[in-house]
Structure formats: structure tokens, C-alpha cells
Amino acid sequence: SLIAALISAMAVPAAAQTISDWETKADRSELFALQPETVEFDYKRNERAAYIVVDPVRSYQTMEGFGFALTGGSAEHLIKMTPSARHEILQEMFNPKDGVGFSYIRLTLGSSDLNSFTFSYDDIEEGKEDFKLKHFSLSQDLKDVVPVMQEILGINPDIPVMSSPWSAPVWMKESGNIRGGKLRKDCYQVYAEYFVKYVQAMEKEGIHIDAVTIQNEPLNSRNTPSMPWDPADQIEFVKNNLGPEFEKAGLDTDIIVFDHNCDRPDYALAIYNDPDAARYVTGSAYHHYRGDLSAMKYVYEARPDKKIYFTEQMTTERPGMDRIDIAAPVKRLIIGVTRNWSSNVILWNLAADPLNDPHTDNGGCSMCQGAITIDGDKVTRNLAYYVIAHASKLVPPGSKRIFSTAPGERSISICEDEQHPQMWRTNVIEKADVPDNVTFLTPQGKIVMIVSNDSWSRREVNIQYNGKFARVRLAPGSVATYVWDAE
């Protein structure tokens, strides 16, 4: 409420606070660089400025991490690097202290469209079936995904892992094809057992699967691989097969539904409306190739007992550009996604080569640039790398999103009365003219604010926190992460 913001802003003054400033400038002169100059909070208020009011009393979701998908293609490139070069780039990306601290991994359960070829963990001769899963094997992933994931866990043992299938094994599908075709009803039970075997097999390799989504993009049958799945059938699968099998096996792996675009908030809600299915489901996952991010908030407000996850978005740039157009994706994918209740942000491909390979034919993504481009042992850091770094480095898992004034939001202006010194008056601002931002309180007691200046002019970022004020300037098209001690 406005009263709560006022009380927080007028709290008892404390010692001087210094703001650290990490910036990426559109002209590439600074790429997620800690600025040498610091700014201190003081009691000097700009009467004409609109302030971002920060109020840690009002807190929202707990963040679980920011990261990427370790696709089969990503792992294929990483495993081909020399061990020293691979260790160096993995340390840079995943070390929470000395690197940028990517803090969430999405794996593909079987192949995705960013593999050199398609496969499942139970591929058998055409025309045959394997209801006992005697041929189940992680053999393909053991060549690249598993060893790379093990190396990442050696750097950060606490990184959460979510896995998503693009398709069931071909012999389980009505079409008999890896592209499109629904899961056969008589294969629901064996497919649930297939999920269990995967989670258990990865656990034996030292990789704990924290969550699975039931199907990547269940409304897309044009990808290779892909498998369409409507909510009514997923309800049946969850409540009669997958949920009971996970329970029977004693797995603590979360079950996440939907895993597709923001244009269909009804999908997850349909599953939640069946209590026998909903009891097995932790939350729903979203992409943003269609629809509005507010769909996530809509689902959360309908079912606040269920979590929201953001699991995929391709974020690319042309190689060799003089500019880095970072403001828009940070505004949308870090600020927008977290303000709409997502507990994480996972962007798409971690790594590709200069040709954006590998990918499958007939639907595989030919323009899915990685967060990094790998050419032998040479590494190029791309747009998506810096988008996630602005959050992952400074907003560790366990951080809580807290209130900060959004553009166009109602706010409060606090200033000293002109005729009565040391007396304060407040004004209600109906539509605050502030840059896009989101703010977190970390477990270490830091306030972290991420700001995007998605405009062609310089913005003055005015911050009001705990009775003090600070002013920072942000260049056009630039992004900053500001950090200071909470009080």
C-alpha cells in the first residue's frame, strides 16, 4: 500500500550506503562491467524527479535461478574443447563467486531440435516394442551431456536442473514418427516408467533432476522432434500414470505442466481444475514466442499455490555488430518475466558454433545462436550471455523479489515542506515516470535493482530507499544492475 511505502521510506536513518553499479552500454564500451565510480545515498532529494521507491517490506516470489538450456548440441561443442579451455569457460559461466554465476540448467530429455540427430533413450528396431524398457539407455548423453553436466556440478553443486522431453520414443507414438504424432494411450504407463528410469539413471551419474516438464511445446507439432499433447490428455497422464509412478518410486522431482507460449494461460488452469492431477503438479512453465507475459501473472493469481517458471526464449544478435541491443531483452526477459511471478529465467541454447549448428532437419532451429559461440577453443560471448549475467551474478537463488515502483505505477513523492523545515509532506504520483526496473533482496542482505533504459535518451535513475535518495545516470540503450546493503 502507499502507507507501507511511506513508512519504509521514512525509516530511521542509518549509516551511509554505497551503490555498486554493473553496466552494459549499447555501444559495447562496457559489457557487464563494474563501474569504478560509486554513488552514495544521501538526504538530498530532487524535487522535480520521479523516484523508484524500494520497499523490502513488500516481498513476492523467491527466485530459484537464471540460466540456459544445455542442449545436446551445446554439450557436443563443449566436450570437443580441450579440457583446459572447457574448464575455463565453464568456470566463467557457472562459478557463482568468480564467474557470472549462471544458476539454472535446462536439459533435454532425449534429443531436441538442437541435436545433430534425433534419438530417445529407448530406440529399437522399427516395428518392435519395448514395454519392459529393457533397451533403456543414456548412452548418447553419456558421450557429452552427462560429462559436461558433471563438470558444471563440480563448479556449482547446488545448481537446479530441469529436464524437458521433445518426444517420446517413436514406438510409443501413434504416428511412428519423431516429428508430430500423439502418444499412444496404451503407452501412457510405460512412458511414465520411462520418466522414472531417466530420473533414476541421471541420479546414478550424480545429476539430480529437480523438475521435469511433461512436454516441451505441447501445441507445436512442426518441430523435429515434437509431440502434440492437449490438456485433457495430460490430465489423464499426470493423475493416472506419471504422478503415481513418481510417488511409488519415492522421487522428489517436481512435475511442471504446459512449457509453451504465453498465449494459452487456460492450458495449465485446465489441469489445475482437476484436483486429482493438480495434487501432483508443482507449477507451470512458459515461453514467450507468442502472447503477453501477463499471462503468467494471470495463472499465478488464479492459483497462487502453484509456481510459475520461464523455461525458454531464443535471444540472438548478428555477429560483429557495433551495438549490443540489450535494453529490450532485459526489459522483457529479466524485468518483465520476474515481475509476472516467474521463479526463474531460462533462455534457450547455451552454446553453438559460428553457423548456429547443430540442429535437426525439417523443423530444427537454424538460427538459434548460443549464449556463447564456440569455434574450437575460441569463445565469443553473445547477447543472451549478458542478459542473464546481469541477474545471475548478483541475484543468487533464494533471493526474493521486493517492491519497486514500475513505470506508470502509482507512487509517493516525499519532500521537505518549503515553509516548515524538517517537516515532510507527501504527494501521490498517479503515473510514475521511471525506467523499467525490478528489485530483489538477497539472502546475503543485499538490495539488487536491475534497470533497463530502452530509449534513445539518457535517463536519470532516482532511487528512494529507507529515507534516503540516490541518483545514477544511465546511457541510452544501456542496462545496469545496482547493488547496495540492506538496512
Q: What feature does the model see in each segment?
A:
Residues 190-211, 218-318:
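Active-site neighborhood of glycoside hydrolase catalytic domains
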Residues 68, 101, 161, 212, ...:
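Conserved, mostly hydrophobic/aromatic
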Residues 31-209, 240:
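N-terminal catalytic cores of secreted or lumenal carbohydrate-active enzymes
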Residues 393, 398, 404-466, 477:
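Carbohydrate-binding surface patches
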Residues 64-65, 98-105, 156-160, 205-211, ...:
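Loop/turn elements at helix/coil->beta-strand transitions in domains of secreted/extracellular proteins
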Residues 307-393, 402-407, 413:
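Aromatic/acidic polysaccharide-binding cleft in carbohydrate-active enzymes
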Residues 473-487:
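C-terminal beta-strand-rich structural cap/linker in extracellular carbohydrate-active enzymes
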Residues 11-13:
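N-terminal signal peptide c-region/cleavage motif recognized by signal peptidases
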